[in-house]
Amino acid sequence: MTKHRLVALLLVAIVCCASLPGRADDKKDDVDDIGNRKVAHRSIISEEKEIAIGKQYADQIDKQAKILKDPVINEYVNRVAQNLARNSDLKIPLTIKVIDDPAINAFTLPGGFMYLNTGTLMAADEEDQVAGVIAHEIGHAAARHWAQQMTRATIMQFAMIPMMFIPMSYPVYMGVMEAYMNGVPLAFLKFSRKDEQEADFLGLQYMYKAGYDPNAFVGFFGKVMDEERRSPGSMAKVFADHPPTGDRIIASEEEIQKILPKRPEYLVSTSEFDDIKARMQTLITQRKRQSKGDTGPTLRKRSTPDSTSTPTQSGKQGGDSGDDQPPVLQRRD
């Protein structure tokens, strides 16, 4: 590496480090202080601006994704999510929608806009596993990870302004641009994984505060690993920015033992969750029938052998006389 490129790389590294927003780490481990402590990272993006940006992204998702229209399922998911939000450090409103997609996934946009795939609902055995996934996403929103990323990007853009006045032929120009194009994305990926770890850390506390068994969150990791074994690479894209699943399991188990006191009982599931899964299965079955052109049984009137009979005195065809048998059900081929 040339001297100019080394200096340029160090320059960009210093700017990146200087641009990393801190966090008011106030009683982060104190579950009893949830809702009063400060876990959000400092950012030059205001909450109002973050919500406005998130609304723009959400509008695009709503147009492009297949948003589930079932009011019963949507109401249930929203109720579970809002209960978790009330037992979290989130300072902005939470909006959650369900995407009709069989993949196991959930994600959060800036400003508290959240999406949950139907595949996550179907993969869960109990309500507490769904709560764990939602609580993780609330952890992202509460810590304002999106605002943190946008702050870094904004500062980096300003940091690159002086490059406009340096001739492109200068070695230092090429060195800075190489560092910017190669080093910055790697730094963002690294911190994104730290964000995921923090979201796990906070999410476990939120579901515990809401009365759920935090071990259910660890249990759902088993679902992810099973899916990966059944279909290698299927989860790689979804969890590319996450730490390895095995590491997340170990870290979560340690957190549960250290800062989450055992309770005599937890909310595991509800009969409503079973109803929701049954309703989802019905929708899936109906969708499969429709995709095959099978809409189920249809009514057809039985005709007489003599379809060429002459009109009767009442003006009807002989085959349509009042002596016909009642209609019968026949399945469409």
Residue ranges and their predicted role:
Residues 1-10:
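Bacterial N-terminal signal peptides that target proteins for export
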Residues 2, 24-32, 307-310, 326, ...:
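Long amphipathic alpha-helical segments used for membrane anchoring, targeting, substrate engagement
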Residues 9-18:
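Bacterial N-terminal signal peptides
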Residues 17-21, 91, 324, 329:
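Intrinsically disordered low-complexity regions specifically enriched for long asparagine
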Residues 20-284, 293:
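A Zn2+-metalloprotease active-site environment signal
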Residues 293-307, 318-333:
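Short acidic, low-complexity intrinsically disordered linear motifs used
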Residues 313-317:
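Extended, charge-rich alpha-helical interface modules
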